[in-house]
Regions:
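Glycine-rich active-site loops that engage anionic ligands at enzyme catalytic sites
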Residues: 27-36, 40-106
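Start-of-domain signal
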Residues: 1-44
Length: 106
């Protein structure tokens, strides 16, 4: 994890033996949630598929909804408070579950 600015935190999503993906957490999108996530790192879990457009990892992070959105673009990262999950969007999603936007896959 590296901080290149006050607002952007660069991290890597590592899939054991498969890939290492650069991500950016953007503090200005959801400062409270980003703070909880960064203090909880590293986060380890299996990747789960929610549907054809979303994969997620479960966390022990307990944060409520912050600046919720229901529309996400391919490459977005969001926190799903109902399940305590960090979600990664593989395709655009319109009118989905309300989630807290937290960053982007690079």
């Amino acid at each position: 994890m590296s901080t290149d600015s006050v607002s952007i935190i660069n991290i890597f999503l590592e899939i054991k033996g498969k890939a290492r993906i650069s991500c950016q957490l953007k503090r200005h999108l959801s400062p409270r949630t980003i703070g909880l996530i960064t203090r909880s790192m590293p986060i380890h879990d299996n990747v789960h598929r929610m549907n054809k457009s979303v994969v997620y990892i479960k966390t022990n992070i307990d944060s409520g909804m912050e600046r919720k959105k229901t529309d996400f673009k391919k490459g977005d990262i969001a926190y799903f408070p109902t399940g305590g999950c960090i979600c990664f969007f593989l395709n655009d999603v319109l009118d989905g579950q309300p989630m807290t936007p937290i960053g982007k896959l690079l």
